[in-house]
């Protein structure tokens, strides 16, 4: 019989080891590392289950709500994504799916520790918001309705009425029905905890600037506010009251020919260092000069500035870390950025609207600007850019100098008939070899931009990339097969406008060992999709959206029907086939 003292000692050692593992586990935040740790043994699995505080689900159909709550009963933060990313570009049917209702039900019933909820590209009803508000009440600290739809201001009123201690409320780029402005008034009257309020890029028209001023006065911890198109002079009282504000985005500056200096006396909070003013023109730009040296983030996506205006402003922002703008910045603007902003970490350059006068050569981004940027801003970690011209040399420069780059996205516009240097095979190889920290990679070109050899380079030299978007790359199925022999850690693959057959796509999927999600639009589609069944396996859902004609408004305001090519969406799911597919989605279950 075992000695009682020895038995007690063994039990004590086990308990001590468990305590140590539990303490260590709290410092493991990368989901992939967490997953690996949980597979060591049953004890580690249980500790991970009990201590995991945050989960992000890249697609809400990959597991059932009750399975998630059983696996991680003590979650404090949950992020759910619904519609595929392509929905942001109007490529996915509005009724595709992504309903939050089953998740809200589970949160209300079983996830009692949850304090932060983030829904992205999902359909949210007023009933969902009301149930969430009543279930979590003052325990809910963060609610993000990120690019969501389906609710009204009644749902928001329920949230702010029942969740009086909410710290973050976000509705950026969401679409909804506005009945009144009671929700903001209620928030202003009864909340003293708010830190972040964001309804940027929304169409609220019935809310009062006075309520924003009251919020600023009552919530001393308010550090970030992003709003819609308020006339900026209506926010003078808000700016005066928001003593601790660090970030502001939105508003509206409207040039008045009869009053050229009407904004010159506008005073911003002294701690403001992240800023974006909608419709700011060159005449209003000087209001930023007094505190430009302290600006860390600048959003110029909706400013009305030309290339030289960018140059003038950027020179005055030597501590800039984040810049978002449009390609009107031009090569000249990027050269100034490279010269003056050595601490830049994130750069996003979107495509400018055609009506903004892009015919001016100054308003174009090309290899010249990219080379200057790579040499001058070597702290860059994120770079997303639309270019009008490109060379292999510019990509090689990025690989040579930007060693901290984790996320790189490049789109080659189709406005120029001739591109200086195609294909980009050698350039992309040099970039991927040099940027060893890359985790996210998007390369969206045009026909002839990348050969099969270049596509094989992407597979060979992307050992750590987890998400990838490829557009108009490769020449044949063989290129895709060579690509699929690499990318050992690729989890999400999106492709558009490629020449691959269904058979090649299915074969490539089976060779990518870590792949969990696939979206393809614009491939050699068949009538039946039968060849896609070669990638069928347990827990792997395959959905098709057949080609369809969709009404779109062109630049002249005319409504015309556009042809949308067929889509493939395939993903791992422990929940099986979803039950809410609309008629526009066809589920592949077995060979036809």
Swiss-Prot record:
GO terms for biological process: anther dehiscence; defense response; defense response to bacterium; defense response to fungus; extracellular ATP signaling; jasmonic acid and ethylene-dependent systemic resistance; jasmonic acid mediated signaling pathway; negative regulation of defense response. CDD domains: F-box_AtTIR1-like (cd22159). Disulfide bonds: none annotated. Changing residue 22 to A: Abrogates SFC(COI1) complexes formation, loss of response to jasmonate. Disruption phenotype: Mutants coi1-1 to coi1-14 are male sterile, insensitive to MeJA and coronatine, and exhibit enhanced resistance to Pseudomonas syringae atropurpurea (coronatine producing strain). Mutant coi1-16 has reduced sensitivity to jasmonate, but is male fertile when grown below 22 degrees Celsius and male sterile otherwise. The keyword DNA damage does not apply. Component of SCF(COI1) E3 ubiquitin ligase complexes at least composed of ASK1 or ASK2, CUL1, RBX1A or RBX1B and COI1. Interacts with ASK1 and ASK2, but separately. Also binds to ASK11 and ASK12. Interacts with RBCS-1B and HDA6. SCF complexes interact with the COP9 signalosome (CSN). Interacts with TIFY10A. It comes from Arabidopsis thaliana (Mouse-ear cress). Changing residue 348 to A: Loss of interaction with TIFY10A. Required for jasmonate-regulated plant fertility and defense processes, and for coronatine and/or other elicitors perceptions/responses. Seems to not be required for meiosis. Required for the regulation of some genes induced by wounding, but not for all. Component of SCF(COI1) E3 ubiquitin ligase complexes, which may mediate the ubiquitination and subsequent proteasomal degradation of target proteins (probably including the ribulose bisphosphate carboxylase small chain 1B RBCS-1B and the histone deacetylase HDA6). Keywords: Jasmonic acid signaling pathway, Leucine-rich repeat, Plant defense, Repeat, Ubl conjugation pathway. This is Coronatine-insensitive protein 1. SUPFAM superfamilies: RNI-like. One of its GO terms (cellular component) is SCF ubiquitin ligase complex. The keyword Repeat applies. Changing residue 302 to A: Loss of interaction with TIFY10A. Jasmonate binds at residues 85, 348, 386, 409, 496. Residues 16-57 form the F-box domain.
């Amino acid at each position: 019989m075992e000695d009682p003292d020895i038995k007690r000692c063994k039990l004590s050692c086990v308990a001590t080891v468990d305590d140590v593992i539990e303490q260590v586990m709290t410092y493991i935040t990368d989901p992939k590392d967490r997953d690996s740790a949980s597979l060591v043994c049953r004890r580690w699995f249980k500790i991970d289950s009990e201590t995991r505080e945050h989960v992000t689900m890249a697609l809400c159909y990959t597991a059932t709500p009750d399975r998630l709550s059983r696996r991680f009963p003590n979650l404090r933060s949950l992020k759910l994504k619904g519609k595929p990313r392509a929905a942001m570009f109007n490529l996915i049917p509005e009724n595709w799916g992504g309903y939050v209702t089953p998740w809200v039900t589970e949160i209300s019933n079983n996830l009692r520790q949850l304090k932060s909820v983030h829904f992205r590209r999902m359909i949210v009803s007023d009933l969902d918001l009301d149930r969430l508000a009543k279930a979590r009440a003052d325990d809910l600290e963060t609610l993000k309705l990120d690019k969501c739809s389906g609710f009204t201001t009644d749902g928001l009123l329920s949230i702010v009425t029942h969740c009086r201690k909410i710290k973050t409320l976000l509705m950026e780029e969401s679409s909804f029905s506005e009945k009144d402005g009671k929700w903001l008034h209620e928030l202003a009257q009864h909340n003293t905890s708010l830190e972040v309020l964001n309804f940027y890029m929304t169409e609220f028209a019935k809310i009062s600037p006075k309520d924003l001023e009251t919020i600023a006065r009552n919530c001393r911890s308010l550090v970030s506010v992003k709003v819609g198109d308020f006339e900026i002079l209506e926010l003078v009282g808000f700016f005066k009251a928001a003593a601790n504000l660090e970030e502001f985005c939105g508003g509206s500056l409207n040039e008045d020919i009869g009053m050229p200096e009407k904004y010159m006396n506008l005073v911003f909070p002294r701690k403001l260092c992240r800023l974006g003013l909608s419709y700011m023109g060159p005449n209003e730009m000087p209001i930023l000069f007094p505190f430009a040296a302290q600006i860390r983030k600048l959003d110029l996506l909706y400013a009305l500035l030309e290339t030289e205006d960018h140059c003038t402003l950027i020179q005055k922002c030597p501590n800039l870390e984040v810049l978002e703008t449009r390609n009107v910045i031009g090569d000249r603007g990027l050269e100034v950025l490279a010269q003056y902003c050595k601490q830049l970490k994130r750069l996003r350059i979107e495509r400018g609207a055609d009506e903004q006068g892009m015919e001016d050569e100054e308003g174009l981004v090309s290899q010249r600007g990219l080379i200057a940027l790579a040499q001058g801003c070597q702290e860059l970690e994120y770079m997303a850019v639309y270019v009008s011209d490109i060379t292999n040399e510019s990509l090689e420069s990025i690989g040579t100098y930007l060693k901290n780059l984790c996320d790189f996205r490049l789109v080659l516009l189709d406005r120029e008939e001739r591109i200086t240097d195609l294909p980009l095979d050698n350039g992309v190889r040099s970039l991927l070899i040099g940027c060893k920290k890359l985790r996210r990679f998007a390369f969206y070109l045009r026909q002839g931009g990348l050969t099969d050899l270049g596509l094989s380079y992407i597979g060979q030299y992307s050992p750590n990339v987890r998400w990838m978007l490829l557009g108009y790359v490769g020449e044949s199925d063989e290129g895709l097969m060579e690509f699929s022999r690499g990318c050992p850690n690729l989890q999400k693959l999106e492709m558009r406008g490629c020449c691959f057959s269904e058979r090649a796509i299915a074969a490539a999927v089976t060779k990518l060992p870590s792949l969990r999600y696939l979206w393809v639009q614009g491939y050699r589609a068949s009538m039946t999709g039968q060849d896609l069944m070669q990638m069928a396996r347990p827990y792997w859902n395959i959905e098709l959206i057949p080609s369809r004609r969709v009404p779109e408004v062109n630049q002249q305001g005319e409504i015309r029907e556009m042809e949308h090519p067929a889509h493939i969406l395939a993903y791992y799911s422990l929940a099986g086939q979803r039950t809410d597919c609309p008629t526009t989605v066809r589920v592949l279950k077995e060979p036809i």
